[in-house]
């Protein structure tokens, strides 16, 4: 990897406070780009617009989703923008490239009865169950990202309100409330889960050895819960984030409030990540449209 690319990644880590997961995506995008340059015998410095178009075609030939192609092009556009600040002779070859349109899709979410089934699966009387329940409760009750979840420290939890302070993207801090079920789960976990009582750190969530749990560890916990839950086949942390937002909107929460809770800068981002179910759309329509129902005579 070129020195300027390493400097770029360090900038994203130090100045923009990107998560390890996001940094890996940027790194992998640059590695793939470098591989293309080697194949085509193109120099990074002399790479130009026609080469950018060829690279776009190359990405599509790999049968990648449009959203993935869009992200990879965005990575390179951002990289060249950074390089231009370091070297006045550099021109961004991706600036004129038409951004691939993203596919429209409805984010996956759990129905309320599916969430209840997940909670019923988690044991209430085992050490592991106490910890796993807190993970599930916090993700569903607050809609926080998994990267935010694993970085919660004991001082971030406020049992009086109750709620949690999280550090989101761009090093932005926000407070997210949670309900009584979540509060009780956290209290029982802190009171009875032995590994956390003997730690030398202040992270809320730990593994069975008392070390801070990782994002990978959280995904393992969720997959284990799903395997034991009838009628539920797939789960990931962001699906719980979608579920959190969807259920709030279905119960009448306004988009601005959900935006604040999710930690989104732009309302349009919230619009992409949240939606109401088809059943709720029909319910609103039937209640609101003057000719939705035919009156009986």
Swiss-Prot record:
Gene3D superfamilies named among the record's database cross-references: 1.10.150.130, Intergrase catalytic core
Parts of the chain that traverse the membrane: none
Primary location group: cytoplasm
Gene Ontology molecular function, alphabetical: DNA binding; tyrosine-based site-specific recombinase activity
Domain Core-binding (CB): 1-84
UniProt keywords, alphabetically: Cell cycle, Cell division, Chromosome partition, Cytoplasm, DNA integration, DNA recombination, DNA-binding
Any GO BP: cell division
NCBIfam families: PRK00283.1, recomb_XerA_Arch, recomb_XerC
Family statement: Belongs to the 'phage' integrase family. XerC subfamily.
Self-association and partners: Forms a cyclic heterotetrameric complex composed of two molecules of XerC and two molecules of XerD.
Described purpose of this protein according to its UniProt entry: Site-specific tyrosine recombinase, which acts by catalyzing the cutting and rejoining of the recombining DNA molecules. The XerC-XerD complex is essential to convert dimers of the bacterial chromosome into monomers to permit their segregation at cell division. It also contributes to the segregational stability of plasmids.
The protein's name in its UniProt record: Tyrosine recombinase XerC
Taxonomic source organism: Staphylococcus haemolyticus (strain JCSC1435)
């Amino acid at each position: 990897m070129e020195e300027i690319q390493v400097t770029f990644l360090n900038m994203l880590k130090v100045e923009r406070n990107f998560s390890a997961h996001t940094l890996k995506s940027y790194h992998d995008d640059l590695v793939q780009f470098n591989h293309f340059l080697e194949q085509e015998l193109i120099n990074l410095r002399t790479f130009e617009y026609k080469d950018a178009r060829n690279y776009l075609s190359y990405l599509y030939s790999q049968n990648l989703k449009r959203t993935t192609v869009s992200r990879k092009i965005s990575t390179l556009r951002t990289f060249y923008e950074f390089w231009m600040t370091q070297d006045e002779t550099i021109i961004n070859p991706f600036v004129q490239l038409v951004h691939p349109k993203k596919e429209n899709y409805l984010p996956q979410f759990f129905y309320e009865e599916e969430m209840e089934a997940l909670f019923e699966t988690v044991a209430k009387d085992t050490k592991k169950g106490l910890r796993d329940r807190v993970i599930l409760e916090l993700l569903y009750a607050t809609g926080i990202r998994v990267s935010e979840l694993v970085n919660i420290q004991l001082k971030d939890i406020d049992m009086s309100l109750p709620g949690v302070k999280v550090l989101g993207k761009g090093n932005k801090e926000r407070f997210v409330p949670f309900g009584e079920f979540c509060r009780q789960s956290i209290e029982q976990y802190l009171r009875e889960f032995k590994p956390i009582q003997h730690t030398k750190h202040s992270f809320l969530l730990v593994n069975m050895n008392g070390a801070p749990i990782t994002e990978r560890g959280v995904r393992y916990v969720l997959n284990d819960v799903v395997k034991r839950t009838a009628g539920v086949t797939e789960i990931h942390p962001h699906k719980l984030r979608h579920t959190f937002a969807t259920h709030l909107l279905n119960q009448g929460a306004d988009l601005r409030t959900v935006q604040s809770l999710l930690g989104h800068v732009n309302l349009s981002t919230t619009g992409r990540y949240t939606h109401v179910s088809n059943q709720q759309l029909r319910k609103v329509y039937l209640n609101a449209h003057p000719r939705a129902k035919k009156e009986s005579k």
